[in-house]
Amino acid sequence: MTVSTQVSRNEYTGNGATTQYDFTFRILDKSHLLVQTLDTSENIVTLTLGTDYTVTGVNRYNGGKVVLTSALPAGYKISIERSTPVTQEASIRNQGGFFPEIHEDAFDKLTMLVQQAYGWWSGLSLRKPSWLANYYDALNNRIRNLRDPSQAQDAATKSYVDSSDIDLQQQITSNFNRSLRVHDSYISQLP
């Protein structure tokens, strides 16, 4: 058979009742899935096979189901991703019998690994939109855990800008409190 789809990840939103979620791609073993949830506070939890979920449809070309032990709360998201180990387990001997299924599975696994690497590159990495671009595109995603800037051209965190703004506001208030004020509008401003 072939790996006839480029899909290697499915994502769903919980409704508080559903426990079964489809994955629409082939896996060679039930441990070849990475199942994660995202709560409404944007905390990511990696689920454990056998404890948090079970898998049906192993080695089916059109996929199977992840069955959660409890329903995913409303508003939570679930990601089901192929996570194939980077190993080569097919042993092909010289002068041995030719078993097409062994070759087919080995080539399928290579294709799955390429899809997995492509998925990481295309969906998760901060990258330039083109080789010609001189900037990185976050694709409308936030960037977390960024250090405070130390060089003039470094990116600044919200916390750093907020604290700098507070310092500036305090300086302006201090200067304003020491200024001479008159309420008559005909007096011109001092140089």
Task: Name every feature range the model reports, one short phrase each.
Residues 130-151:
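Small/polar residue-rich beta-strand/coil "junction" motifs that cap repeat-based extracellular fibers
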